[in-house]
Amino acid sequence: MAKVLALSFGRKMSNTDVMLKEVLKKCEEAGHEIKFMRPDDLEIKPCIGCCGCVVGIMSGRTNGACVFKDDFHLVEDAYYDADAVIIGSPVYETSPSGTFKTFCDRFGPSHDLAFLTEAKKRAYRSGQ
């Protein structure tokens, strides 16, 4: 049984919500554990490009946590707990929703597996 997470970046009760819930219903019928989240319902601040997450990882001082203490960790924890993630976003003016862009910015390099692997190698070589 897999854990399936659906992240909806559309308006509440929008077509995006409806489509994701329909997919989740099929997943549940197939015996999978499901979770639906709307990041718009949470307090998630936009990335300010301070690179605190990256510097923390590279220096070995932190695990790459964002300097903001908001609800992003709820989405992050659900994302890492899931075996499959389905993301839905409407397209506004040829771009995804602003909340989805914020999610991508906040999930940036501090969550990139290649970057994290390289940072661990550097820390190991430097004796940290």
Predicted regions and their residues:
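Short, conserved loop/helix-junction motifs that constitute active-site signature segments
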Residues: 116-128
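N-terminal beta1-alpha1-beta2 submodule of the flavodoxin-like/Rossmannoid cofactor-binding fold
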Residues: 1-116
